[in-house]
Amino acid sequence: CCAFKTSLLMKINHDANVVIGQYQFADSLNKEVLHQLKYATDIGHTNVKASLHTGWDWLPNNQKVINFKSFIASEIYHNYMTQLVSSKRYNVLVANFWGNVYKKGDSAITHDHLHYAYSFAYFVKAKWYDSPLVFDDSAKKIRPKEGRYVIFPAYLKHHVPKHRYNHERITLSGNLDLVL
């Protein structure tokens, strides 16, 4: 009884900085990802109930993916790290990177990425009316748009509602760490 009530009372609304942008080389990256997904294997059950969830270190030697991950790391550095008062210079490293293919009925349950500093989602293939990325604490919804990236502190709980359409909704996701 009491523990349940306490957990409801302890919900905190976070005023976290969420970075949303459009990747300059989206057309080239998206074409490459769609091609590579033809050969990807599904890792099975995760908190993402997608028809395909690639491995956690997907396409580590693909130059377009390497460039994209470098871009995301630089966005994190410029949007978050320059605000730190610390005299130490941190490097931002991509810890893992994967793809998700959502088909009708697929979703992602509420989760976070607490073992990491930052996370991101990137829309490879989606319509504006497809399921959004939803941050639970604020109820902020980020509508999909091909080429759009969303970077956020990894502690933010988020989910993706059930995909209701017959076409695929395809995303890339990743987690990043800070190292000295």
Where are these regions (language model features)?
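Short, Lys/Arg-enriched N-terminal segments with co-localized hydrophobic residues
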Residues: C1-L9
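Catalytic core of non-heme Fe(II) oxygenases with the double-stranded beta-helix
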Residues: V85, Y90-K162, H167-T171, N175-L180
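Non-heme Fe(II)/2-oxoglutarate
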Residues: L8-Y90
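Short linear interaction motif-like sites in intrinsically disordered regions of transcription factors
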Residues: C2, D57-L59, G99, Y129
